[in-house]
């Protein structure tokens, strides 16, 4: 199984084009992230009243929490144009210059995965963000000359899942940093209920709760699960999704009551059965699962760590008692030293 195909991956999938209709259009419709939403509303209202461009905004958080949706909402609330791109797409300074020179006054430019901008592109972006100017070098060698281009005052909205990879000069140019957190089950229930209404299918409170509990704190996953559960309900001639049909559908999709899928359980079972619960190195796990190390560290492990099933220790990955209980296995006797200093572990290389 390749990780992008997992129904519970927080990364965007090809079939997620169907979630566009489920996205809120205004801040008042956006569920969750209460403090971030309240602050954004104040900053937007203030910029609109002054007739100025909003300060540059940086959204930081795991994938699937609504960074792109919030960027679109910011532009809509400001009543300005919206242009979207991503860090890997902007290959050279000229690509960025083309985007910036086509922006109107106060427009929003959204750059997803902004941590993946090349250093050469970043250098061009600094004066654009700070002084609304482009400093470009035209030509090569002795004939090269510097050209300064004035830009319309715009708002750059950046999004990143890995804030630690941002350079300090780039991070410091964002006046409004916003960190997004995982959603509560109650918030996801509201999102699922609204989504069912948009999809024109009924849903009971316990049906919404069943989907929300397995959505791993992530609206994108909740929307994806809702669409698949709706298919099961339609096939069974059900006019509404209740707990029974939700449980049946999600079990058929191999998403268990804790939100773990077959890959998660395979990961935990491999450590439990083959390595006595650990510690085991990440390279060993990558080979055992036939998955790249990056996929292990960035896609599989974060949710398992968040739920308390896994520890990263200096000696390797280690299952917790919670993991053995979830797998229905007896926990082997282990030396306390395996857990690292005071039971906490640093990153194992």
From Swiss-Prot:
GO terms for molecular function: ATP binding; ATP hydrolysis activity; four-way junction DNA binding; four-way junction helicase activity. It is found in: Cytoplasm. Has 3 domains, the large (RuvB-L) and small ATPase (RuvB-S) domains and the C-terminal head (RuvB-H) domain. The head domain binds DNA, while the ATPase domains jointly bind ATP, ADP or are empty depending on the state of the subunit in the translocation cycle. During a single DNA translocation step the structure of each domain remains the same, but their relative positions change. GO terms for cellular component: cytoplasm; Holliday junction resolvase complex. Residues 257-349 are annotated as: Head domain (RuvB-H). Mg(2+) binds at residue 68. Residues 1-183 are annotated as: Large ATPase domain (RuvB-L). ATP binds at residues 22-23, 64, 67-69, 130-132, 173, 183, 220. It comes from the Bacteria. Keywords: ATP-binding, Cytoplasm, DNA damage, DNA recombination, DNA repair, DNA-binding, Hydrolase, Nucleotide-binding. InterPro entries: AAA+_ATPase, AAA_lid_4, DNA_helicase_Holl-junc_RuvB, P-loop_NTPase, RuvB-like_N, RuvB_C, WH-like_DNA-bd_sf, WH_DNA-bd_sf. The gene is ruvB. Homohexamer. Forms an RuvA(8)-RuvB(12)-Holliday junction (HJ) complex. HJ DNA is sandwiched between 2 RuvA tetramers; dsDNA enters through RuvA and exits via RuvB. An RuvB hexamer assembles on each DNA strand where it exits the tetramer. Each RuvB hexamer is contacted by two RuvA subunits (via domain III) on 2 adjacent RuvB subunits; this complex drives branch migration. In the full resolvosome a probable DNA-RuvA(4)-RuvB(12)-RuvC(2) complex forms which resolves the HJ. Its EC number is 3.6.4.-. It comes from Rhodopseudomonas palustris (strain BisB18). SUPFAM superfamilies: P-loop containing nucleoside triphosphate hydrolases, Winged helix' DNA-binding domain. One of its GO terms (biological process) is DNA repair. DNA binds at residues 293, 312, 317. This is Holliday junction branch migration complex subunit RuvB. Residues 184-254 are annotated as: Small ATPAse domain (RuvB-S). The RuvA-RuvB-RuvC complex processes Holliday junction (HJ) DNA during genetic recombination and DNA repair, while the RuvA-RuvB complex plays an important role in the rescue of blocked DNA replication forks via replication fork reversal (RFR). RuvA specifically binds to HJ cruciform DNA, conferring on it an open structure. The RuvB hexamer acts as an ATP-dependent pump, pulling dsDNA into and through the RuvAB complex. RuvB forms 2 homohexamers on either side of HJ DNA bound by 1 or 2 RuvA tetramers; 4 subunits per hexamer contact DNA at a time. Pfam families: AAA_lid_4 (PF17864), RuvB_C (PF05491), RuvB_N (PF05496). It catalyses: ATP + H2O = ADP + phosphate + H(+). Belongs to the RuvB family.
């Amino acid at each position: 199984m390749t990780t992008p195909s997992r129904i519970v991956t927080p990364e965007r999938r090809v079939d997620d084009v169907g979630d566009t209709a489920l996205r809120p259009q205004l801040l008042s419709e956006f569920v969750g992230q209460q403090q971030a939403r309240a602050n954004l509303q104040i900053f937007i209202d203030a910029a609109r009243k002054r007739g100025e461009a909003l300060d540059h905004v940086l959204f930081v958080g795991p994938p699937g929490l609504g960074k792109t949706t919030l960027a679109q909402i910011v532009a809509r609330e400001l009543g300005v144009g919206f242009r979207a791109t991503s860090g890997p797409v902007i290959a050279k300074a000229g690509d960025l210059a083309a985007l910036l020179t086509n922006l109107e006054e106060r427009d929003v430019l959204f750059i997803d995965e902004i941590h993946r901008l090349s250093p050469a592109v970043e250098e061009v972006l600094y004066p654009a963000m700070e002084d609304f100017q482009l400093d470009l070098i035209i030509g090569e060698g002795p004939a090269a000359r510097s050209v300064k281009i004035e830009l319309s005052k715009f708002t750059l909205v950046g999004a990143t899942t890995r804030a630690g990879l941002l350079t300090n000069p780039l991070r410091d140019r964002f006046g409004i940093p916003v960190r997004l957190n995982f959603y509560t089950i109650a918030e996801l229930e509201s999102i699922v209920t609204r989504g069912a209404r948009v999809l024109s299918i009924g849903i009971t409170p316990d049906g919404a709760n069943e989907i929300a509990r397995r959505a791993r704190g992530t609206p994108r996953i909740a929307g994806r699960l809702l669409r698949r559960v709706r298919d099961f309900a339609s096939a069974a001639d059900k006019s509404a999704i209740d707990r029974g049909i939700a449980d049946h559908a999600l079990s058929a999709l191999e998403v268990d009551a804790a939100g773990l899928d077959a890959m998660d359980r395979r990961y935990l079972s491999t450590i439990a059965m083959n390595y006595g619960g650990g510690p085991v190195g990440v390279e060993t796990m990558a080979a055992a699962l036939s998955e790249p190390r990056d996929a292990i560290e960035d896609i599989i492990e974060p949710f398992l760590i968040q739920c308390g099933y896994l520890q990263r220790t200096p000696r390797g990955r280690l299952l917790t008692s919670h993991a053995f209980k979830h797998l229905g296995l007896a926990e082997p006797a282990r030396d306390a030293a395996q857990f690292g200093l005071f039971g906490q572990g640093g990153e194992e290389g």
